[in-house]
Amino acid sequence: DALLQSSAQDRMIFASGYQYTGQPILLTEFGGVAFKTNQSEKDWGYCAIEKNEASYIRRLTSLFSYIKTNRRIQGYCYTQFTDVMQETNGLLSIRREPKIAIDAIRAILFGTDDSEPISPVP
């Protein structure tokens, strides 16, 4: 509820004169969790670059858990699927190789085989 009354990155959620009346909320870009698998000095991320695999997994898990359990959010797009040039925000490297075990990525995105996947849809 507080989010709907504020701005995101200094941008209003709704245009002047409009308000939330129950319409689906789509998070059209989120993520930016940087984790480099090479040692380039030019690597960049939106936040501090995660230093190791464990902290990267914790950060991703935290983000996805919040998004998927928020009942108002009906869809989302993670940024980004792969690293590009100097940005290390991808789930996969620039060579399209998973940065962590593919099973770990799957568990973060969809849950584990022994649990129900978390769904944003009530």
Put a short name on every predicted segment.
Residues 1-122:
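Substrate-binding clefts and catalytic carboxylate motifs of secreted carbohydrate-active enzymes
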